């Protein structure tokens, strides 16, 4: 991985981490304030996480990840 690729990877990882924290925060707000509707905020953050997760996934083994997803879906009956 050259310097530019590494810089892009770090940027994407940082953005993913930021969006994961924002999603976790929105979900905790919904749990802690059940009379307030945070569904739109949660949906927005899920979308943001998906975008950056797709960007980061390209640096990892897609076959391995897909296999793990299948196993987890079976394990938790999802």
Where do the model's predicted regions map?
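Flexible "arm" and connector segments at domain edges
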Residues: 1-78
């Amino acid at each position: 991985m050259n310097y530019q690729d590494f810089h892009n990877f770090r940027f994407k990882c940082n953005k993913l981490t930021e969006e994961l924290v924002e999603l976790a925060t929105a979900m905790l707000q919904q749990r802690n304030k059940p009379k307030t509707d945070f569904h739109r905020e949660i949906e927005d953050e899920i979308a943001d996480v998906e975008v950056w997760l797709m960007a980061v996934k390209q640096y990892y083994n897609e076959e391995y990840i897909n296999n793990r997803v299948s196993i987890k879906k079976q394990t938790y009956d999802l």
